[in-house]
Amino acid sequence: KVDKLTFTVTGNGVNQTVKTNAKGEIQIDNLMPGVYTVTEMDYDKYEPQESRRVTVVSGQVSTVTFNNKLKRGDLQIVKSSEDNLNEGVTFHLYGTSLSGIAVDEYAVTDENGVATFEDVLISGSTPYTVEEVDTAVRYVVPEAQSAPINWNEVTNRSFLNILKKFSVTVTKSDAETDTAQGDASLAGAVYGIYKGETLMDTY
């Protein structure tokens, strides 16, 4: 967007505020020869611009150029897990920036479990959302988190993958009577937990 941006031109007794047209241009006619200062109003979504000085020469058109850059920041995700398998995990960052542009980006963790979103447009009043993508089935899926992005700052978030746990209750009974017969006892039986054909533990 380049229209309706406000500039102030000062110098040689002139102090005039003007707005850009649809082409992003302003034009002030009939200025006396001399040096003038052109200043752009600060906008939350743009990096601040330095004022520029321009020399007006009689009979010539003097030009000064401004190039607005949208403010950006970074987001760093640190992933940890109970089994320390933290590389190659994908995170998704999404939302609407302060400038109204949609943000929809992905980053993958490195060997240290760190995923970095660089040069992200700053967020508005509503922060972005960051979530882990395609969480491995062995983990409890971590909740998504809010992630505001501020200009020239690094926002930090951490995600912990917790292994799914389970419990097994075994009740031994007699196949015919459901209770022990005669002097027999159902106590003291040993059970094994297997992964495939591998015995993992006994109880």
Positions of the model-derived regions?
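Solvent-exposed loop/turn and edge beta-strand elements of beta-rich ligand-binding domains
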Residues: 1-203
